[in-house]
Amino acid sequence: MTDPYSNFFTDWFKSNPFHHYPNSSTNPSPHPLPPVTPPSSFFFFPQSGDLRRPPPPPTPPPSPPLREALPLLSLSPANKQQDHHHNHDHLIQEPPSTSMDVDYDHHHQDDHHNLDDDDHDVTVALHIGLPSPSAQEMASLLMMSSSSSSSRTTHHHEDMNHKKDLDHEYSHGAVGGGEDDDEDSVGGDGGCRISRLNKGQYWIPTPSQILIGPTQFSCPVCFKTFNRYNNMQMHMWGHGSQYRKGPESLRGTQPTGMLRLPCYCCAPGCRNNIDHPRAKPLKDFRTLQTHYKRKHGIKPFMCRKCGKAFAVRGDWRTHEKNCGKLWYCICGSDFKHKRSLKDHIKAFGNGHGAYGIDGFDEEDEPASEVEQLDNDHESMQSK
C-alpha cells in the first residue's frame, strides 16, 4: 500500500516546470534537514491554471529538502532584511558565498581601505623637526624686520643730523640772545634729544668755548652778559620793578642737549684728555668748565691773608673765610679746615672730639673741590 501524500507530491512535481528534482523514488540523503517554510509572498503557479495551496503535511516527507531554493530567495533585493532574520532564527548558516556575505566583505574591505587612507593622511600631516612657517608668515616677519630696521636707521640719522647742527652752532661761536633762543634750542622734544645724545656720545669743546661759555645771555639795559638765564633775570630786577615777572621768571629754561653730554678736556697730557691711557670723561660741560679753570686756566683771585691764588671765585671766597683758622682735636691734632676735623673724629671715634670750639656741630657751607682735596691730604698726614 502506497502513501497517498507521496503520490500527491509526485504529481505536483511533474506538473511544475520550475522544479527539476526527481521523484520520491530517489534515495534520501543520509542527513535530512528540517523543512523550509516558504515566505508568505511566495506562490506556486501550476500549468493547469487553477490556484491551489497544498495543506501542510503532518509528518516530514522522505524527499530531500529544497536546498537550491535558498540562493534564489537570498538574491531577492526586496526581502534581504527579512531573509536575514529568518535565516538567523530558523535556517542553518549559509555558506560564505552568498550575496550578503559578498556585500559584507566588500563593505569591510572598503572600510579597511578608508582606514588605511586615513592613516596615510595622518602620517603625511605629521611634521618632524622645527615648524616651518608658511609663505604668509614669512612675508609678515620680513615686513616687521624691515620696518624695525628702517625705524632704527631713521632714529640714527636724526641723532647724527642733530649732533652735526649743534656742533656747527658751537664751533662757529653761536650764542643765545635771549629766552626765545634758548627755548628754540630745547624744543618740544628736548628731553628725547637729550636721552638719545647721552648714549655713547661725547663732546670736546675748544678752550674759547670753555672760558667764554657756550651760551651768553645779555642784559637788554646795560648789555652785561651772563652764562645763565636765571642770573640775568635777577640782574634785571635791579634795573626796576618793570622787569619783574614774578617767581616763574626765575625758572629759566632747561639746558640744551650738548651741555649734558660727557666732555673730554682739550689740554694735552691731562688725565681727562681723550688720548690719556686712563682717560675718563667729565660729567657735563659745567664740570669741564670748573676743571679747566682750576687745572689749566689762570688764577686771578688771591687770598688777602696768605696770598694763595685761585681760579674759581667760589674756591677763593671759601678759603679766605677760613684762612688762618685752626681746628683742634682733644688728642692734640690741629686742622686747617673744619671738615677735616670732623672726618678725623668720625674715623677714630672714642677719645677724639673738637676742643675749644663753640657751635662745632652746626652745619657749615660745603667746601669747594680744592678745599676738599686739601682736607683729604691733611687727614692722611694726621693718620
Swiss-Prot record:
Deletion phenotype: Reduced fertility, fruit length and seed set. Reduced replum width and cell number.
Residue spans of biased composition, Acidic residues class: 361-373
Chain intervals annotated as zinc finger (C2H2-type): 217-239, 264-296, 301-323, 327-352
Keyword field contains Repeat: yes
Residue spans of biased composition, Pro residues class: 29-38, 54-65
InterPro entries per the UniProt record, alphabetical: C2CH-3rd_BIRD-IDD (IPR055187), WIP1/2/3/4/5/6 (IPR043584), Znf_C2H2_sf (IPR036236), Znf_C2H2_type (IPR013087)
Example of a GO biological process term: regulation of gene expression
Keywords: Metal-binding, Nucleus, Repeat, Transcription, Transcription regulation, Zinc, Zinc-finger
Disordered as annotated region, ranges: 19-118, 147-191, 361-383
Annotated tissue distribution: Expressed in developing carpels. Expressed in the shoot apical meristem and the replum.
Subcellular location: Nucleus
Gene Ontology CC terms: nucleus
Basic and acidic residues biased stretches: 81-92, 103-115, 156-171, 374-383
Chain intervals with Low complexity compositional bias: 39-48, 66-80
Motif mapping: Nuclear localization signal: 293-296, 336-339
Domain of life where this protein originates: Eukaryota
UniProt KW Cytoplasm keyword: no
Primary site of residence: nucleus
Entry's Gene Ontology molecular function annotations: DNA-binding transcription factor activity; zinc ion binding
Assembly and oligomerization: Can form homodimers. Interacts with BLH9, STM, AGL8/FUL, AGL1/SHP1 and AGL5/SHP2.
Further information: The fruits of the gain-of-function mutant ntt-3D (T-DNA tagging) fail to dehisce.
Entry-linked PANTHER family: ZINC FINGER PROTEIN WIP2 (PTHR45878:SF1)
Function text: Transcriptional regulator required for normal differentiation of the ovary transmitting tract cells and pollen tube growth. In Arabidopsis, the transmitting tract facilitates the transport of pollen tubes to the ovules for fertilization. May play a role in the regulation of AGL8/FUL, which is required for normal pattern of cell division, expansion and differentiation during morphogenesis of the silique. Plays a role in replum development by the activation of the homeobox protein KNAT1.
Protein name: Zinc finger protein WIP2
Species: Arabidopsis thaliana
Gene: WIP2
